[in-house]
């Protein structure tokens, strides 16, 4: 890929990270509209061209104005840049067709598993991405795309032959935007995107969010994937989830392995629930920019961890750098504490979540195999499960959650991944319920969330139980997706 030369034109391709989310007309100048598209980093260079020549020519041919986020300014949770296209409906469709063509030219090296390096975001690409279009639309436009009872999106899929999925809509919170994923063959995707552009034309508020940088966006941002959490990087993390995430970084604070993870609560006697929330938020921020936080728990002492995090901060964008610096500060505090260098204390007494952690580690629910598979992805997940259990014990001691309160959580799981949660004869699902104390129900086969091929999973129980169950299911789904992405022959 050619390096991007400085742009001398009056209207730059890359604009400052301004955040624009306001009520305004859906058109620009004389019938012009706006379309926001996600572009994988591997395709950005071919879209821009040497010295910006390709994109300049594209603007001349279509009459559109095209802006891209800066080269390292990715949409949260991805390594994809944000492209904002302004023009007539015909121009929007023409520009997107060009972008889609470049996205389909996925380099072969991008589909191969790579060695995880905490210093750089991961760049391994799901091969399915080449057949997808990802559009970011305001919440109001998303409603028009879905239609009453999902009728509109169903019609779009039937007429185009493409799959159209929207990122999940959270309960009680209105995200400014949602991400639409269109999958299929080139002509199918083109037809579906054209139908979406038509909805953009119909929505008076379709131009309410024109920012191309999300580095300074406050509050939750929509997940770029249609499955899993509605959020790309949660801004508000419940205490149980906060501690679970913080525990996953136990390698910053002590010995490697499950013993070190089990010792995590005792290693932070002076850190409050607020500290844990800050640590969790920082970890989520790094994860949202593609950094593998699991690799921080590989036996680094506090001094070594601080060095690794300093290296991350030196090469990251401002948001990720701030998160790395914060974690380095906590690692330094832990290393300077009275327990630094001491032998790890025994694991906490197994409570509800403690039992879940120990059983998960023993039975390898998240390991899903031995040998290479476990080495590639199983061990960190087992450690993370144990970390969640350790965090649960810590929260019980701190009384950060009212365990008696009942809570209902709904998450979406892709149809083709439900089997991973059910297990043979439903055994895995039963075990999840026994380990967490939560009740887990999955919608019947063929009953999907509107506009998706996702089954509804309802989790009921105490806050700690629902958080543990949600964490376990999400990690299982994430792990299974990773295995399938690296091994396309694996089915079920």
Curated annotation (Swiss-Prot):
Pfam families reported for this sequence: KH_1
Q: Where in the cell is it found?
A: Nucleus
Give the tissue specificity.
Expressed in brain cortex. Expression is enriched in excitatory neuronal-linage.
Motif (Bipartite nuclear localization signal) spans which residues? 10-26
Classification via InterPro entries: KH-I_NOVA_rpt1, KH-I_NOVA_rpt2, KH-I_NOVA_rpt3, KH_dom, KH_dom_type_1, KH_dom_type_1_sf
Task: List UniProt keywords, sorted A-Z.
Answer: Isopeptide bond, mRNA processing, mRNA splicing, Neurogenesis, Nucleus, Repeat, RNA-binding, Ubl conjugation
User: In which domain of life is the source organism classified?
Assistant: Eukaryota
One GO biological-process annotation of the entry reads: regulation of axon guidance
Please state what is observed when this gene is inactivated.
Knockouts are born indistinguishable from littermates but failed to thrive, demonstrating progressive motor dysfunction and overt motor weakness, and they die an average of 14-18 days after birth. They have agenesis of the corpus callosum, and axonal outgrowth defects specific to ventral motoneuron axons and efferent innervation of the cochlea. Conditional knockouts in excitatory neurons die between three and four weeks old and show disorganized cortical and hippocampal CA1 and CA3 laminar structure.
**How is this protein annotated for GO cellular component?**
nucleus
Entry note about domains: The third KH domain (KH3) recognizes specifically 5'-YCAY-3'.
Q: What does this protein do?
A: Functions to regulate alternative splicing in neurons by binding pre-mRNA in a sequence-specific manner to activate exon inclusion or exclusion. It binds specifically to the sequences 5'-YCAY-3' and regulates splicing in only a subset of regulated exons. Binding to an exonic 5'-YCAY-3' cluster changes the protein complexes assembled on pre-mRNA, blocking U1 snRNP binding and exon inclusion, whereas binding to an intronic 5'-YCAY-3' cluster enhances spliceosome assembly and exon inclusion. With NOVA1, they perform unique biological functions in different brain areas and cell types.
Q: Which PANTHER family match?
A: KH DOMAIN CONTAINING RNA BINDING PROTEIN
Q: What is this protein called?
A: RNA-binding protein Nova-2
What is the originating organism of this protein? Mus musculus (Mouse)
What's the source species' lineage? Eukaryota, Metazoa, Chordata, Craniata, Vertebrata
In the UniProt record, the gene name given for this protein reads Nova2
């Amino acid at each position: 890929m050619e390096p991007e030369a400085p742009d001398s034109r009056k209207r730059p391709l890359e604009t400052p990270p301004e955040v624009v989310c306001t009520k305004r007309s859906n058109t620009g100048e004389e019938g012009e509209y706006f379309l926001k598209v996600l572009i994988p980093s591997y395709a950005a260079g071919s879209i821009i061209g040497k010295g910006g020549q390709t994109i300049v020519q594209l603007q001349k041919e279509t009459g559109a104005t095209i802006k891209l986020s800066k080269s390292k300014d990715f949409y949260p949770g991805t390594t994809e840049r944000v492209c904002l296209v302004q023009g007539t409906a015909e121009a929007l469709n023409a520009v997107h067709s060009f972008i889609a063509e470049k996205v389909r030219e996925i380099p072969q090296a991008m589909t191969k598993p790579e060695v995880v390096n905490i210093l750089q975001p991961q760049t391994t690409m799901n091969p399915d991405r080449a057949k997808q279009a990802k559009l970011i639309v305001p919440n109001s436009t998303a409603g028009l795309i879905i239609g009453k009872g999902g009728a509109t999106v169903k019609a779009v899929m039937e007429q185009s032959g493409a799959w159209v999925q929207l990122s999940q809509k959270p309960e009680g919170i209105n995200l400014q935007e949602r991400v639409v994923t269109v999958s299929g063959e080139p002509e199918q995707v083109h037809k579906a995107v054209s139908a979406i552009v038509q909805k953009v034309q119909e929505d008076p508020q379709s131009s309410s969010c024109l920012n191309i940088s999300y580095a300074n966006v406050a509050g939750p941002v929509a997940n770029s994937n249609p499955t899993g959490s509605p959020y790309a990087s949660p801004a508000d993390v419940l205490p149980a989830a906060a501690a679970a995430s913080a525990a996953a970084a136990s390698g910053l604070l002590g010995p490697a392995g499950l013993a070190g993870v089990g010792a995590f609560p005792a290693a932070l006697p002076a850190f409050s629930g607020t500290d844990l929330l800050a640590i969790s938020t920082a970890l989520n921020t790094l994860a949202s920019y593609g950094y593998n936080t699991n690799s921080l728990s590989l036996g680094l002492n506090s001094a070594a961890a601080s060095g690794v995090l300093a290296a991350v901060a030196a090469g990251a964008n401002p948001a990720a750098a701030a998160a790395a610096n914060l974690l380095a500060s906590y690692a330094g505090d832990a290393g300077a504490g009275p327990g630094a260098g001491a032998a790890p204390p025994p694991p906490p007494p197994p409570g509800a979540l403690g039992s879940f952690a120990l059983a998960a580690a023993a039975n390898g629910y998240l390991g899903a195999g031995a040998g290479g598979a476990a080495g590639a992805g199983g061990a960190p997940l087992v450690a993370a499960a144990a970390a969640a259990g350790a965090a649960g014990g810590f929260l019980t001691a701190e009384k950060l959650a009212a365990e008696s309160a009942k809570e209902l959580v709904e998450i979406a799981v892709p149809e083709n991944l439900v089997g991973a949660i059910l297990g043979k004869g439903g055994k895995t699902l039963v075990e999840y319920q026994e380990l967490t104390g939560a009740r887990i129900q999955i919608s019947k086969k063929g009953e999907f969330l509107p506009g998706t091929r996702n089954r509804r999973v309802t989790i009921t129980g105490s806050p700690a139980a629902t958080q543990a169950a949600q964490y376990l299911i999400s990690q299982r789904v994430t792990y299974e997706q990773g295995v399938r992405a690296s091994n396309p022959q694996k089915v079920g």
